[in-house]
Amino acid sequence: MIIFTDVISGDELLSDAYDVKLVDDVVYEADCAMVNVNNGDVDIGANPSAEEGGEDLEDGTETVNNVVYSFRLQQTSFDKKSFMTYMKGYMKRVKAHLAEKNPEAIEAFENGAKTYFKKVVSSFGDWDFYTGESMDPDGMVVLLNYREDGTTPYVAIWKHGVSEDKI
């Protein structure tokens, strides 16, 4: 299994247990699901009994995003201006990391990041934002949106801002 770990904060953000796809050679996207959680147990709602009336939630049960829940991501918020300011600083931190670890990837990162960043900004109101468990303000902000079907959530993380740790 591969765990995607933020190179700035050290937070675990995603794993290949989810269907991870590389987009524009700069962002990993993974579809998520909304699941029911009861006292730490996860119920994905599969195979409900024919006698049950539906998926009524039991007391103490809540519906959560499985990636957000599994990696203990913390929701945060931005207006467009503060997000752009954050991203400018974050991109500098990732570029400094790449200069030290993988200088030949800097150009691909800069070009791909600009393209994906424009996509996010153009649909800014559709995105939710999460930090890693440590809530490090310098760390990566995980992006969450919905596919074209309007019901399938997905997360996006910056490829060059994570290390891929095999466990």
UniProtKB/Swiss-Prot annotation:
Keywords: Cytoplasm, Cytoskeleton, Microtubule, Protein biosynthesis. GO terms for biological process: cytoplasmic translation; negative regulation of autophagy; negative regulation of microtubule depolymerization. One of its GO terms (molecular function) is calcium ion binding. GO terms for cellular component: cytosol; microtubule; mitochondrion. Residues 1-167 form the TCTP domain. It is found in: Cytoplasm, Cytoskeleton. Belongs to the TCTP family. PANTHER family: TRANSLATIONALLY CONTROLLED TUMOR PROTEIN-RELATED, TRANSLATIONALLY-CONTROLLED TUMOR PROTEIN. Involved in protein synthesis. Involved in microtubule stabilization. This is Translationally-controlled tumor protein homolog. It comes from Debaryomyces hansenii (strain ATCC 36239 / CBS 767 / BCRC 21394 / JCM 1990 / NBRC 0083 / IGC 2968) (Yeast).
